[in-house]
C-alpha cells in the first residue's frame, strides 16, 4: 500500500486536471453510475465536532474508496487544522488496500475543484472580481480553482478575525500575484463581487444584503442542518440553485433547510445537480443577469476520484512510501 502525505500531494497537483477529474466524477454521479450513499455525520464532544464517513464506488471509473474526516472548529485556537482525515483507495479488481492519502489537503483541493467546476459553468465569462468570505484553509483551494477558470483581476476578503484575512491577502498576492483587499463589512465586500465564495463554520448568515444581478455564489461551508451561511433570500431569489446531490443537499445543509422551513423555497426549486449541467442535460448560466448559487456539501465520489488521480500521479513519479501489512 502506498502512503501519500499532504506535502507529496501538494507537489503532484495540477488544479486544471483536478477540476476535470471532479467534473467527471460529478457527471458519473448524476448519471446514477456510482454507489455514493449519503455520508454518515457523527457529532462528538457535546456536538461541537463532527466525524464524516464517506464511501463510494464508481464502476465506470474503476474506483473504490472511503474517506473519513473530522471537523473540529476550535482547533484553530490552538494552531491545529480544523479538518483532519484520511482517504483509503482499494484495488478495483482484487479489493486489496491500494493507497492511504492524508485527507485534509485532499479535501481542500477537492472543495476548490468543485467550486471551479461550478464557476466554469455558472459564473459570467467576464467575471473579474472574486469575494471570499472566510479565509481558512478551504479558501486556498477555492481561490486557486476560480483563478483556473476565470481571469480574476481583484480579490476581496472578509473574515471575522481580521488578522487572518490580512494573512490570506498576503498569501494571494505572493502565490498568485493578484491584488487582494480586506474589507471590514461582509455586505460591502459582496457588493463589488462578480463571484462570491463563502467558506465558514457559521450557524447564521454571513451577510444580509441582497445579491446583485449577474453574481455567482459558491457556498461551501454549511454541511449540517444547524449551519447556515447564506441568508434565506439569497436562495429564494436566485435564478438557479445548483447542488452536487439533491438528496444530500436537502438532508445536510441549513442553507436549504432553513428557507424551505420558512416557506421561501421548495426542494423542487433546485435547478439541477452540477453533473447534469456538465453533461448538457440541464442548462448552466444562460444570461449575464442571472443570479446563480452552487450549494456544496461535498460528495464522496469526487474525493475518491481525486484520490485516484493523486495515486496515479504518485506512481508515475515514484512518490510516496510503500508499506506492507
Curated annotation (Swiss-Prot):
It catalyses: L-proline + NAD(+) = 1-pyrroline-2-carboxylate + NADH + H(+); L-proline + NADP(+) = 1-pyrroline-2-carboxylate + NADPH + H(+). GO terms for cellular component: cytoplasm. GO terms for molecular function: oxidoreductase activity. It comes from the Bacteria. Coiled coil: none annotated. Keywords: NAD, NADP, Oxidoreductase. The keyword Methyltransferase does not apply. InterPro entries: NAD(P)-bd_dom_sf, ODC_Mu_crystall, ODC_N. Its EC number is 1.5.1.49. SUPFAM superfamilies: NAD(P)-binding Rossmann-fold domains. Catalyzes the reduction of Delta(1)-pyrroline-2-carboxylate (Pyr2C) to L-proline, using preferentially NADPH over NADH as the electron donor. Is likely involved in a degradation pathway that converts trans-3-hydroxy-L-proline (t3LHyp) to L-proline. PANTHER family: KETIMINE REDUCTASE MU-CRYSTALLIN. Belongs to the ornithine cyclodeaminase/mu-crystallin family. This is Delta(1)-pyrroline-2-carboxylate reductase. The lineage of its organism: Bacteria, Bacillati, Bacillota, Bacilli, Bacillales.
Amino acid at each position: 500500500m502506498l502512503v501519500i502525505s499532504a506535502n507529496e500531494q501538494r507537489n503532484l497537483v495540477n488544479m486544471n486536471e483536478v477540476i476535470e477529474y471532479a467534473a467527471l466524477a460529478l457527471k458519473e454521479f448524476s448519471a446514477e453510475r456510482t454507489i455514493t450513499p449519503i455520508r454518515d455525520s457523527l457529532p462528538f464532544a457535546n456536538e461541537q465536532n463532527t466525524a464524516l464517513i464517506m464511501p463510494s464506488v464508481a464502476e465506470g471509473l474503476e474506483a473504490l474508496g472511503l474517506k473519513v474526516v473530522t471537523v473540529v472548529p476550535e482547533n484553530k485556537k490552538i494552531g491545529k487544522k480544523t479538518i483532519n482525515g484520511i482517504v483509503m483507495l482499494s484495488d478495483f479488481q482484487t479489493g486489496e488496500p491500494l493507497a492511504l492519502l492524508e485527507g485534509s489537503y485532499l479535501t481542500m483541493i477537492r472543495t476548490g475543484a468543485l467550486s471551479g467546476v461550478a464557476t466554469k459553468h455558472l459564473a459570467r465569462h467576464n467575471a473579474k472580481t472574486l469575494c471570499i468570505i472566510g479565509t481558512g484553509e478551504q479558501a486556498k483551494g477555492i481561490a486557486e480553482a476560480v483563478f483556473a477558470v476565470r481571469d480574476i483581476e481583484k480579490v476581496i476578503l472578509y473574515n471575522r478575525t481580521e488578522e487572518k484575512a490580512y494573512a490570506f491577502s498576503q498569501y494571494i498576492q505572493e502565490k498568485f500575484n493578484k491584488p487582494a483587499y480586506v474589507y471590514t463589512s461582509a455586505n460591502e465586500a459582496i457588493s463589488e463581487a462578480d463571484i462570491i465564495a463563502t467558506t465558514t463554520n457559521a450557524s447564521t448568515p454571513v451577510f444580509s444584503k441582497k445579491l446583485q444581478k449577474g453574481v455567482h455564489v459558491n457556498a461551501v461551508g454549511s454541511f449540517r442542518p444547524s449551519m447556515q451561511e447564506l441568508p434565506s433570500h439569497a436562495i429564494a431569489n436566485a435564478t438557479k440553485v445548483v447542488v452536487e446531490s439533491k438528496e444530500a443537499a436537502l438532508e445536510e445543509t441549513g442553507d436549504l433547510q432553513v428557507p424551505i422551513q420558512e416557506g421561501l423555497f421548495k426542494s423542487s426549486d433546485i435547478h439541477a445537480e452540477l453533473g447534469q449541467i456538465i453533461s448538457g442535460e440541464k442548462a448552466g448560466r444562460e444570461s449575464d443577469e442571472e443570479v446563480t448559487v452552487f450549494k456544496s456539501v461535498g460528495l464522496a465520489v469526487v474525493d475518491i476520484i481525486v484520490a485516484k488521480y493523486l495515486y496515479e500521479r504518485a506512481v508515475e513519479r515514484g512518490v510516496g512510501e510503500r508499506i506492507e501489512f
